[in-house]
Amino acid sequence: MNTDNRVSPQAPEIEEAILGACLIEQEAMPLAADTLRPEMFYTTSHQVIYAALLAMYRAGMKIDILTVKEELAHRGKLEEAGGAFGITQLSSKVALSLIHI
């Protein structure tokens, strides 16, 4: 428990861009897997999504929007992750992030 009342660092837009990149860019997940852990994500839904992505990557499974939705549904975590629409929306966050750079 955080007893000094400081707010944890958070950047949901960056989290969304990272997750979106992992969904649509094959090179992104190996980089993320080397440096990120699910608990590093501030948003609970992002932790759930990244945990599934990481497990799929480590198992050698194909990662894309459809397979991640299926994996989350199989785990009973799809709604906690933001639902099918939320997962699909992550891919658009990558393009929007690039526009703002």
Question: Where is each model-derived feature located?
Answer:
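Noncatalytic partner-interaction/assembly domains of nucleic-acid and motor enzyme complexes
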Residues: 1-98
